[in-house]
């Protein structure tokens, strides 16, 4: 009997565990089903949003008792992650609140917590979407208009804070302004005087704020035909127009209007007092931007009209399209499909809106959100999905960009070149070049012929020289790149008169016979240190002729491909390091690469990148070489600045990596110390596993890491000082010479150079910002020419 009872007890225990697992599994299934229903509400094409909502409310109401927390979390996540369905979810919450007042209060508290947490963690978009959601709950009779106005007033109070960056004040004003299209009508009807008071405070702030940064962020230096408005100014103009129209907009879907008779009976909740977190030095706020405009209604002759630049519909459409790109940019096909499935596509010229928004992203200053190729690949997919209309709109946009290129920002010029060459390569390099042949009459430094020349150079990287020659009309011959072949001077007819020819020929034979690096060093010993025509590059600390013979001979032998060149450099790495002991020697190496490969820009870029990776040349040497007299003829060509930017990025990545490693080591050290002190105090065996001795870095290791980081910071600062000092020198010299000769200094060369200076500031703004006070003290002083000083002041204003 005792055995049977024991067996029965075991069966009961097993059944209990199995039933518990089944309940957990069933609960998980229900939770997943609820999440799926909430996420997909309003997306069924077979029934209306309103009937979707009614059905979902019935389901959720029945499950509130068991899955309350899960439903709260899903709804608050949807509010932040799916802002395009904001009004659908606010209606859902409103209907639930009408049936269950307690749940409505819990949701408001949960949403307020999400909003405050987003502000605290500097998740600015999430905070703005949370605020919008709270505001739209006023329309659904969940939140009182009075308490929302108190919150908006509190946010505008930030605009009066002293000693905080303007970008902080700007964001809080922007967050309030961008919320008003959703709730403005309701506030106007219920609290008109309070709304007007709020708008007056915003206007006072906007009138007094600095816009020093504006010119640095413009795509074009001219406002014709479309003004380039600063984002807050543009949104304020749109809100003012909306106010003139009595807050009636035509874009936002408002499903709650159908349920007004139900919602107006519900009790409302008051928002608690919400105080924005105070500013901290480690807070990073969104930078200002300029609203990009390419089209107006005259560019869209057929179909629906494009909303005006100051209509709130333009803002809402653009924001929605930007959000689609943000959500789907990882998958170009999905992104293109979603853009073309825009919910209001029959009310607007959708293709024009999409193209304008994509170029707005591509030309966004200081840097685009995503890689250039991301936007190019999305445009290609759009052309495939909409072949009847989108290619024509894109061609029209390209024509507009080309005609306005004279005043285009230098950074945007580069992006335009990169995009257009990539686009051509995907469409058989077909273009109506004859329509642009008027540019052939212009000076070579003018942006139009320069654009075509740079596009062809980029196309060469994506194709081959004969293909480029065949695709272009004969009239464009002077803009077609040279055949990319090495110019090995020791094989030329005049080589017999060159001092290193004999050794060069000896070196060719030795390398072909697979000699060792040591044997190369022995051969090079025979080269005398004098009698070299390029000796003026040397200060006597290195043998310029030895570098000349070795670099040109080795790279010529490896000229068959990038791989051959890389293999040659790697094999004779020790020889390079021995020859490149000083910065002057490194500059000499770079000069010889240019001399050999002057007709192959891409080869120069990849070779110099390789030399930097192998630490054969320093970043500072590359910067000095770029600004040397030998490179004057190349100074306005894109590839040279591509080299400079990859050099700066390499230095920046090195500093960031060391910083990250040091922070990680310090954290481990602190945790190890904390763990050891806990082990002394804590007698419990149920504590976390402490960091082992092997994981714990010693204090000496941390000190060495600090020294390495300090040295890297010194090198980084030196690199920026070299670059900016050289810019100041050549620009000051040009301005002084123009003034002395009585000439207009505003030449094509000057605009390219000042544009490149601005580009360095903006492309590397996060790293340059650290040294802004040093730059102001040493280089950008008050006695500097205002044209140069303004570039620095505009850069500083971005984070001011």
UniProtKB/Swiss-Prot annotation:
GO molecular function, one term: mRNA binding
Pfam family, one: MIF4G_like_2
Gene Ontology CC: nuclear cap binding complex; nucleus; postsynaptic cytosol; presynaptic cytosol
Compartment annotation: Nucleus
GO BP term (any one): 7-methylguanosine mRNA capping
Region (Disordered): 1-26, 669-700
Tagged with keyword Membrane: no
Keyword terms: mRNA capping, mRNA processing, mRNA splicing, Nucleus, Phosphoprotein, RNA-mediated gene silencing
Disulfide bonds: none
InterPro entries xrefs: ARM-type_fold, CBP80, MIF4G-like_typ-1, MIF4G-like_typ-2, MIF4G-like_typ-3
Record Gene3D superfamilies: 1.25.40.180
Subunit architecture: Component of the nuclear cap-binding complex (CBC), a heterodimer composed of Cbp80 and Cbp20 that interacts with m7GpppG-capped RNA.
PANTHER family xref list: CAP BINDING PROTEIN, NUCLEAR CAP-BINDING PROTEIN SUBUNIT 1
Protein purpose: Component of the cap-binding complex (CBC), which binds cotranscriptionally to the 5'-cap of pre-mRNAs and is involved in various processes such as pre-mRNA splicing and RNA-mediated gene silencing (RNAi). The CBC complex is involved in miRNA-mediated RNA interference via its interaction with Ars2 and is required for primary microRNAs (miRNAs) processing. Also involved in innate immunity via the short interfering RNAs (siRNAs) processing machinery by restricting the viral RNA production.
Family: Belongs to the NCBP1 family.
Protein name: Nuclear cap-binding protein subunit 1
Origin species: Drosophila erecta (Fruit fly)
């Amino acid at each position: 009997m005792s055995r049977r009872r024991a067996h029965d007890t075991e069966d009961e225990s097993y059944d209990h565990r199995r039933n518990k697992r089944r309940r957990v599994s069933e609960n998980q299934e229900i939770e997943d089903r609820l999440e799926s229903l909430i996420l997909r509400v309003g997306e069924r094409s077979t029934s209306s949003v309103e009937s979707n909502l009614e059905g979902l409310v019935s389901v959720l109401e029945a499950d509130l008792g068991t899955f309350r927390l899960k439903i709260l979390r899903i709804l608050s996540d949807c509010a932040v992650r799916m802002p395009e369905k904001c009004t659908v979810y606010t209606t859902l919450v409103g209907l639930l609140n009408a049936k269950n007042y307690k749940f409505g209060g819990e949701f408001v508290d949960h949403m307020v917590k999400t909003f405050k947490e987003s502000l605290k963690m500097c998740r600015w978009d999430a905070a703005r979407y949370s605020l919008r959601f709270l505001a739209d709950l006023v329309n659904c009779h969940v939140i009182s208009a009075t308490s929302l106005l108190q919150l908006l007033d509190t946010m505008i109070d930030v605009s009066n804070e002293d000693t905080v960056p303007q970008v902080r004040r700007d964001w809080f004003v922007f967050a309030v302004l961008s919320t008003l299209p959703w709730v403005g009508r309701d506030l106007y009807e219920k609290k008109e005087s309070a709304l007007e008071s709020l708008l007056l405070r915003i206007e006072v702030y906007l009138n007094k704020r600095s816009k020093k940064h504006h010119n640095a962020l413009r795509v074009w230096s001219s406002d014709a035909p479309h003004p380039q408005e600063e984002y807050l100014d543009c949104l304020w103009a749109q809100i003012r127009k909306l106010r003139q129209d009595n807050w009636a907009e035509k874009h936002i879907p408002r499903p709650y209007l159908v349920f007004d008779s139900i919602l107006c009976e519900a009790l409302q909740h008051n928002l608690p007092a919400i105080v924005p977190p105070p500013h901290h030095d480690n807070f990073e706020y969104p930078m200002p931007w300029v609203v990009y405009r390419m089209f107006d209604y005259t560019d869209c002759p057929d179909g629906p009209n494009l909303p005006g630049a100051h209509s709130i519909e333009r803002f809402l459409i653009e924001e929605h399209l930007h959000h689609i790109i943000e959500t789907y940019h990882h998958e170009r096909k999905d992104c293109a499909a979603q853009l073309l499935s825009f919910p209001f596509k029959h009310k607007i010229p959708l293709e024009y809106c999409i193209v304008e928004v994509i170029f707005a992203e591509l030309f966004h200053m200081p840097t685009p959100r995503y890689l250039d190729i991301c936007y190019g690949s999305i445009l290609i997919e759009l052309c495939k999905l909409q072949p009847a209309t989108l290619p024509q709109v894109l061609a029209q946009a390209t024509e507009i960009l080309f005609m306005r290129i004279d005043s285009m920002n230098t950074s945007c010029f580069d992006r335009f070149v990169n995009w257009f060459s990539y686009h051509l390569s995907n469409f058989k390099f077909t273009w109506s070049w004859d329509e642009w042949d008027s540019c052939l009459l212009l000076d070579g430094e003018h942006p139009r012929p320069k654009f075509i020349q740079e596009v062809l150079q980029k196309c060469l990287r994506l194709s081959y020289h004969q293909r480029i020659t065949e695709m272009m009309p004969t009239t464009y011959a002077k803009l077609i790149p040279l055949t990319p072949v090495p110019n090995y001077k020791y094989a030329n007819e005049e080589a017999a008169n060159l001092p290193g020819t004999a050794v060069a020929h000896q070196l060719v034979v030795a390398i072909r016979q697979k000699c060792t690096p040591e044997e190369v060093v022995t051969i090079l010993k025979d080269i005398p240190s004098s009698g070299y025509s390029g000796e003026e590059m040397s200060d006597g600390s290195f043998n310029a002729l030895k570098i000349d013979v070795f670099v040109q001979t080795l790279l010529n032998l490896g000229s068959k491909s990038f791989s051959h060149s890389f293999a040659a450099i790697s094999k004779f790495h020790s020889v390079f390091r021995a020859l490149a002991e000083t910065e002057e020697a490194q500059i000499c190496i770079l000069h010889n690469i240019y001399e050999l490969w002057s007709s192959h820009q891409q080869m120069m870029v990849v070779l110099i990148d390789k030399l930097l990776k192998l630490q054969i040349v320093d970043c500072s040497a590359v910067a000095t070489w770029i600004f040397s007299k030998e490179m004057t003829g190349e100074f306005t060509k894109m590839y040279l600045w591509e080299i400079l930017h990859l050099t700066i990025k390499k230095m920046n990545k090195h500093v960031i990596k060391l910083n990250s490693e040091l922070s990680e080591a310090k954290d481990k050290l602190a945790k190890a110390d904390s763990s050891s002190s806990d082990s002394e105090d804590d007698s419990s065996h149920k504590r976390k596993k402490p960091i082992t001795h092997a994981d714990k870095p010693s204090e000496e290791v941390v000190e060495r890491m600090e020294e390495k980081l300090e040295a890297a910071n010194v090198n980084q600062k030196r690199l920026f000082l070299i670059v900016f000092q050289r810019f100041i020198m050549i620009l000051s010299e040009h301005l002084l010479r123009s003034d002395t000769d009585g000439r207009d200094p505003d030449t094509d060369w000057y605009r390219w150079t000042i544009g490149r200076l601005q580009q360095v500031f903006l492309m590397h703004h996060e790293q340059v910002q650290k040294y802004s006070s040093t730059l102001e003290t040493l280089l950008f002083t008050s006695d500097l020419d205002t044209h140069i000083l303004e570039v620095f002041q505009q850069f500083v204003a971005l984070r001011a």
